[in-house]
Amino acid sequence: MSDSDTALVARVIASDDRGAFELLVRRHQSAVRNFLRRLARNDSERANDLAQETFIKMYQGIASYRGTARFTTWLFRIAYHTFLNDQRGRHANEEFNDDEHGNVADTTAHTADALDVDRALERLSVRQRAVFDLHYKKGMTHSEIAETLELPLGTIKSDLVRGHEKLKEWLTGGSHEQIA
């Protein structure tokens, strides 16, 4: 039976167990990279760099993990703040640029619909993308998301409702804006 995240954290804190740290990284690196990739609008190279920075920060601050929340809640909070710090350095309100994503051949209606949804999700604010990702991809509850992003529960619920409204508008053609 594999060790729980909490047990691995305890081993890292108690004896600087590199093997336990490596296991934590292997266990969570894919989820962290995917989360960051979606926040970074599918920029895999940037997501990989941010994931590496996230795990460095995790190691440096692991003694601050108290176990009052799930380890993944704590880890995704680090990832989210790492992304926000990087984003501030790049330009806080970066415009979505369709040209950087290229045009994908419309081979099937399903592929086109999925592409439209992905592009629409990319148009949401960073915070709304994070809320959607943590809720729909990671299966976190509203309370867990609020704790992870350090936001009030009402803000999380509002972001989900407003995000749904925006997506519906963009995807049903209720807006004059095109997703392209």
Regions found by a protein language model. Name each.
Residues 2, 86-112, 177-179:
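Short, basic/polar amphipathic helix motif occurring as a linker/hinge flanking DNA-binding modules
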Residues 13-23, 33-53, 153, 180:
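Short, charged helix-capping/linker segments at alpha-helix termini
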Residues 13-14, 38-42, 52-70, 89-91:
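Sigma70-family region 2
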Residues 131-135:
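A short pre-motif secondary-structure segment
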Residues 25-44, 61, 121, 170-173:
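Amphipathic, Lys/Arg- and hydrophobic-enriched alpha-helical face
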Residues 60-67, 77-97, 110, 162:
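Arg/Lys-rich amphipathic alpha helix in sigma70-family domain 2
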Residues 41-42, 119-123, 147-150, 164-180:
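C-terminal edge and immediately downstream basic/flexible tail or linker adjoining helix-turn-helix-like DNA-binding
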Residues 1-26, 30-31, 122, 169, ...:
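N-terminal module of bacterial RNA polymerase sigma factors
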